[in-house]
Regions:
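Active-site "substrate specificity/gating" loop of NAD(P)-dependent dehydrogenases
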Residues: 1-4, 26-27, 103
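Catalytic tyrosine of NAD(P)H-dependent dehydrogenase/reductases that use a Tyr as the general acid/base
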Residues: 7, 15
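Active-site helix of classical SDR
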Residues: 10, 18
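Alpha-helical segment proximal to the catalytic Tyr-Lys
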Residues: 23-27, 85
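Short, flexible catalytic-loop segment of classical short-chain dehydrogenase/reductase
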Residues: 36-47
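A conserved structural motif in NAD(P)-dependent oxidoreductases
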Residues: 61-72
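Non-catalytic, hydrophobic alpha-helical segments
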Residues: 72-73, 79
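Short C-terminal tail/terminal secondary-structure segment
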Residues: 77, 88-103
Length: 103
């Protein structure tokens, strides 16, 4: 949203920080990831629930439901358990397929 420029800039900056630290820490055996949640049911999204209920029903995401905080937690748990030992600097989208919907 153009009304949330500060939020958008901060998120974009995290992408660069992820790549920077992935490169710097790889020699130490430390992998770095960026976890990008999509539409997640939370206090932050509560004010726009009706809007996103409609968008999700209309196919905003291939997985037609709100994301839950536990969806993000499960992704982070997999990373913390070293489930991807030969991967670093990557974006992990937890977004119900939102990023592929325009194929």
């Amino acid at each position: 949203s153009t009304n949330r420029g500060d939020y958008c800039v901060a998120k974009a900056g995290l992408g660069m920080v992820t790549k920077l630290f992935a490169a710097r820490l790889a020699d130490l055996g430390i992998n770095v990831y960026e976890v990008c949640p999509g539409v997640i049911a939370s206090d932050m999204t509560a004010p726009v629930q009706a809007k996103y209920d409609k968008l999700i029903d209309e196919g905003l995401t291939p997985i037609r439901r709100w994301g839950e905080p536990s969806d993000v937690g499960k992704a982070v748990l997999a990373l913390a358990q070293d489930a991807f030992p030969f991967t670093t600097g990557e974006v992990i989208n937890v977004d119900g397929g939102f990023t592929i919907r325009r194929i």
